[in-house]
Amino acid sequence: MAERANLVFHNKEIDGTGMKRLISRLIDHFGMGYTSHILDQLKTLGFHQATTTSISLGIEDLLTIPSKGWLVQDAEQQSFLLEKHYYYGAIHAVEKLRQSVEIWYATSEYLKQEMNSNFRITDPSNPVYLMSFSGARGNASQVHQLVGMRGLMADPQGQMIDLPIQSNLREGLSLTEYIISCYGARKGVVDTAVRTADAGYLTRRLVEVVQHIIVRRRDCGTIRGISVSPQNGMTEKLFVQTLIGRVLADDIYIGSRCIAARNQDIGIGLVNRFITAFRAQPFLAQPIYIRTPFTCRSTSWICQLCYGRSPTHSDLVELGEAVGIIAGQSIGEPGTQLTLRTFHTGGVFTGGTADLVRSPSNGKIQFTENLVHPTRTRHGQPAFLCYIDLHVTIQSQDILYSVNIPSKSLILVQNDQYVKSEQVIAEIRAGTPTLHFKERVQKHIYSESDGEMHWSTDVYHAPEYQYGNLRRLPKTSHLWILSVSRCRSSIASFSLHKDQDQMNTYGKKDREIFDYSTLVRIMPNGHWNLIYPSIFKENSDLLAKKRRNRFVIPLQYHQEQEKELISCLGISIEIPFMGVLHRNTIFAYFDDPRYRKDKKGSGIVKFRYRTLEEEYRTREEDSEDEYETLEEEYRTREDEYEYETLEDEYGSPENEYGNPENEYRTLEKDSEDEYGSPESKYGTLEEDSEDDYGSPGESSEDKYGTLEEDLEEESEDEYESPEEDSIFKKEGLIEHRGTKEFSLKYQKEVDRFFFILQELHILPRSSSLKVLDNSIIGVDTQLTKNTRSRLGGLVRVKRKKSHTELKIFSGDIHFPEEADKVLGGCLIPPERQKKDSKESKKSKNWVYVQRKKIIKSKEKYFVSIRPAVAYEMDEGRNLATLFPQDLLQEEDNLQLRLVNFISHENSKLTQRIYHTNSQFVRTCLVVNWEQEKKEKAGASLVEVRANDLIRDFLRIELIKCTISYTRKRYDRTSAGPIPHNRLDHTNLNSFYSKAKIESLSQHQEAIGTLLNRNKEYQSLMILSASNCSQIGLFKNPKHPNTIKELNRRIPIREIFGPLGVIVPSISNFSSSYYLLTHNKILLKKYLFLDNLKQTFQVLQGLKYSLIDENKRISNFDSNIMLDPFLLNCHFVHHDSWEETSAIIHLGQLICENVCLFKSHIKKSGQIFIINMDSFVIRAAKPYLATTGATVNGHYGEILYKGDRLVTFIYEKSRSSDITQGLPKVEQIFEARSIDSLSPNLERRIEDWNERIPRILGIPWGFLIGAELTIAQSRISLVNKIQKVYRSQGVQIHNRHIEIIIRQVTSKVRVSEDGMSNVFSPGELIGLLRAERAGRALDESIYYRAILLGITRASLNTQSFISEASFQETARVLAKAALRGRIDWLKGLKENVVLGGIIPVGTGFQKFVHRSPQDKNLYFEIQKQNLFASEMRDFLFLHTELVSSDSDITNNFYETLEPPFTPIYTS
């Protein structure tokens, strides 16, 4: 009884770790047998209690946490603030994602802690609580998802979804939450399935490598060891784990007293003595050397002492134990059980999450300010850092609370601040951050609204995308999207589009656009003028397209004023990009309505051209040769080319009309083989001008569509890709490179051309045809279910791989009596119809005769007789009939010529689109001048205002040289910053460059075309630079005082330089090289709505200024419509202006909430109008972008909602859950290179191999080099693998991993340097075998260390039977047979395969005879020590040589004491 009274009575709950401790103490105290008896009683007790308690589980037992409501509210408020900061442009997208994930993760974790205390206080016998927290079933995180909140989920890529699931499973999820939840859950299910297979295969490979490793001897006699010391940043726990169960490699002294001898195994008692010794004298304690499998000298087995204690009991491992297989299974097995942390997968946390300290109640907080230092949190918010533990008091109404805050925490509140209950007052940094594998991730940011892009810093052009639109930001700055309202209409009297912009006015299908013709133009005298109501007629689809290097401006003509002219000419003027015209450039064209195709549809155009010298043949010469020549001229080239459209005839019209941009999909090809260059003969403009593209005028007034055509080889191969030609496709529109110039040399004249109707349908393979091949049909016959023929005639069907072609040839067929006499492919005029033909009726039209062959009977020919429409070319059209003649006075040196072009190539099929007309002939105006004059002309648009009328002129003038307004362009190839990505200062808007003004006055002669805005003037007129007076932004001799007066009236403006002028009533002539202005902020000179007149006085007339990118001020018409509601007026009072030192200037970008003039700016934006008492801000959205981010797009480019703006590259920590963890372990074992092995191990080994022999400079160099290399890589590999497992909380003893790593690194490759008689170069041999062979032969063998993966190691063992049973059986056996290999059956697997006794087990010793090697042990040790001392002297002399790789040389001295001392780190 007395004994029992002295026993300690423990009265507390016991959990898993407590149970572990109890069992290990029982084993130490009583041994294995008795312990198992005690544990049996425990088990019985447990089952008895569980049965009597009879725990049941109901949904009522899931208690929700009361504090959840305000916690979630708190987190939502933080998220809202975050969103707001993002909106202001204070943080960037990646930062927002990180913080939001952190906020919700912290909330979720705090809820989890609350849950534990909640259960403990309210219902300690709750079955859910009992089950999960006793470790019986379930864990805290599962219960947390049931009663707390589900928290953050990861998507399948492992990226965090920043919308948290706030509900728990007890409350039920909303639809969105359910979908997000499925993401994470599905990932979990897939991972579980995948990891089982992965882990199983990993185990198999590991066991394969080490199955032959057995404990065969007591001691191998090594004197080497690995040093372990707690000073090297190793935690105490890790230190204990590493030491227990090992054997000492050297005696250990404290002072002069030896406390442990060599070859003694280390138990818990010894470890505790070490730790106390280290604590007492941390600096004097020497590292402890232990034996490991690495240091064992045996090749294919291991000795007792190098292995240490058995994992099962506290004694040395027994001889005959198969430790290799145990090791393989110990590593592979946890892989199947590693916990899956689904909700942590986002891995956005770089450290552990911080613990938050919350205020216990409302009250005033106080702490000693001297103990804290101001700093910032990792999110940039101000905070205080306390270096020592801080005592904080909170004074509520009647109670004084005190809170202790540990050192190195951040205080998030001010002293004497009033805090609310549960407010976060401090943040405790988590301990050592867990291991995270970093990876670089790209995040794309997309624009949230339409707008124009600006940035507030210089950018680099990324050199690899020299001509692309990607830029790199050299420093953190804002990108701005300036608001633009969605309407892209052609309200402007003529449209000048920026590069690549598309303008639509919507056709009848688009009803959502209201009628813009109600918008009126503000005229100075106040009368209203409707702009182009004609655009809004039904069924007008207009698409103006700015091509790569020219502008298109339609000239509108009004019918009632043009009786003597051709009605409804749509003249389109094209101005090249830089405004420079070369000789013989076409700068305007229009379409003559007489050469328009009628609505009959598609067909073939035929003509013959004659050179200018050729004499015109009259039609009366009806000789037989005439027919011969005709036949040759007009022979169809059917074998070479036919036509087919990309138009899907069977598509629904909805698709076509839905989006006007898709309607015109034309693919042309210049058949260069036939015609040389596109400009060679008769200069077809078809390739270049894309017909109706880009001539808005003709489309809106003359309703006809484009020609669609495509070449198709008749031969079986598919049509060629358009890449071969110089046409390229962009955004559904075709552009063509090259300028439209042609030379007179090749020009042919055409006297007449013919149009022969023909129809082509491209049908899908699947469609069933209602007509037969070679049959004759009438008009409007049904061809397929929803296609009808437009022509009557002969049907030809041809089936291709992807589609079916159906051609209809108009006309009748005729069977001649004698097949030979029929001529194929000739045209017959109306007078000479064949009398003997069976056609009795006489035709007034020309007839085209085509010879066909019926496929079925080879002899029978027939002739297809097809009507042809003849068009005569009109030679008489000239400038006089085009324009009123009296206004045109041609100068000597600039001429305009009129040229007609046929828009189609000879014998080509042209396809009709829907119910539209198409044009055959296009008339062009060509500008030309004498050869010896200057080589270039400049074109510009001029606006002249006089007497309330606005007139626009196209001015063409000769230019001396381009230097006057283009400086040297920036060199695009250099990667230096381009200032604001601008082209260059002077060439953007040369109206403001002095040089250009001089060049204007030098050339008085110029042709100007009037682009009429007012019905009174439609004409071409001459305008010379001297006729106009410029009043504007530079001092003019005629009005020297203009600007000064204005500046006197508005004193503020002097700060900002000239901000535009209010125009005197006489005239304002401003010639702006529109073509050169690349980026400008633009404003409509329209009054938007009547009732806004008062508010937006500022928008009226010309009382405002606009700026372009280069801070130049200008007044322009534009295509960007600014919505008045996007503009905010800020009134600036003089007094407030003087008080605040804020200086604003045009174009300044201001973030929301910036304090200017005593009031906050309510919206972010750009100042772009400054008045006397106010300024106008154009709404804009800032996006913060960090250094190195890539910007997509150009400065001033218009982006639409959803376009990609910026790409961030940021590092995120890879989550170390199983999906990333197991593969990492596997990669290391397989010796594949992975990013997070900081320097690649393979490379590190190479370096060592090269360096060490050079440093040591002795014949043993290779041996030492290889050994040091192998030692170094082994240590680093073990650490890497342990990190992955420890991060998952899995404990694996180091020696299991060491046994496997030893096999992976035990081979060296014989190098070619020294040819040895024993091994062939490139052969893999064991390191020890190489050493022994070297000693035996007395010559050095050259080899280098290599790292084999576990698979390769399994295929490089000494037993070919083991290899063959693993992989590649046939290959391994064949090789072994050819080489005559012998298998000594040393391992387990070989014996199992052959059915022998396996050489393991405790009876093993009887088979083993003592080897004579043991007797020589002492002598060897002596020799080793001799070598060690020599090495030490050598290294002492050359310390600085070795210090290049610090990792190892720190310990180099000890390395050779007991030779190996690399260090384990946690």
Curated annotation (Swiss-Prot):
GO terms for molecular function: DNA binding; DNA-directed RNA polymerase activity; zinc ion binding. Keywords: Chloroplast, DNA-directed RNA polymerase, Metal-binding, Nucleotidyltransferase, Plastid, Transcription, Transferase, Zinc. Binds 1 Zn(2+) ion per subunit. It comes from the Eukaryota. It catalyses: RNA(n) + a ribonucleoside 5'-triphosphate = RNA(n+1) + diphosphate. Its cofactor is Zn(2+). CDD domains: RNAP_beta'_C. Disulfide bonds: none annotated. It is an enzyme of class 2 (transferase). InterPro entries: DNA-dir_RpoC2_beta_pp, RNA_pol_beta''_euk, RNA_pol_Rpb1_3_sf, RNA_pol_Rpb1_4, RNA_pol_Rpb1_5, Rpb1_funnel_sf. Belongs to the RNA polymerase beta' chain family. RpoC2 subfamily. This is DNA-directed RNA polymerase subunit beta''. It comes from Lolium perenne. The gene is rpoC2.
